[in-house]
Design a protein with these regions (language model features):
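Acetyl-CoA-dependent GNAT
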Residues: 3, 7-13, 17-93, 101-110, ...
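C-terminal "cap" of GNAT-fold acetyltransferases
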Residues: 51, 83, 117-131, 135-137, ...
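Active-site acidic-Proline motif in GNAT/NAT acetyltransferases
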Residues: 91-93, 97, 125-126
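Substrate-recognition "cap/lid" segment bordering the active-site pocket of phosphatases
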Residues: 96, 105, 132
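Short glycine-rich hinge loops at helix-strand junctions in the catalytic core
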Residues: 98, 115, 138
């Protein structure tokens, strides 16, 4: 099997949108409610929103296995020394193959190329599999946040 990670171009944002919708509906049910999943997908993963994110400095990486998109990451610079990992998602059937770690490492490399000394990320407090993966990669709990995102929904995250 051949896997590649590449900087996503504008046409690949539609693949990222499709992946996000599939992954979130499969993975997050049981962590957050279906209405919150649909709200967050509409707010953050529409093609229009992804294009706006890219136009304002968000970088997208796309992970492919044998040419097929199976995961992605997105990150942006907060300030000259800090990069924020906004998104890192992988199709569930590809978990536990090291692909998530490869996406994380690719993001870390991109951050250091930009001279950042810190990579921050948020993870839902109930996403125990992702928390464990980030801890294995050396990340630790920095702070907790509970913030409204609209329509009665909240993010309940750890910042690592």
């Amino acid at each position: 099997m051949t896997t590649t990670i590449e900087l996503a171009d504008l046409p690949q944002l539609s693949q990222i949108s499709d992946l996000a919708h599939s992954i979130w509906r499969d993975y997050y049910l049981g962590i957050i409610s279906r209405p919150q999943i649909e709200f967050m997908l509409a707010a953050d993963y529409s093609l229009d929103q992804l294009e706006k994110d890219r136009a304002t400095g968000t970088n997208f990486l796309i992970l492919k296995e044998n040419g097929q998109a199976i995961g992605f990451a997105a990150f942006h610079t907060l300030n000259p020394s800090v990069v924020k990992l906004d998104k890192l998602y992988l199709e569930t059937q590809h978990h536990r193959k090291g692909y998530g770690q490869r996406l994380l490492q690719a993001t870390e490399r991109a951050a250091t190329e930009d001279a950042a000394s810190l990579l921050l990320l948020n993870v839902n407090k109930h996403n125990v599999r992702a928390i464990a993966a980030y801890r294995r990669a050396g990340y630790s709990h920095h702070q907790s946040i509970l913030a409204p995102i609209g329509y009665g929904f909240f993010v309940d995250d750890y910042v690592l």
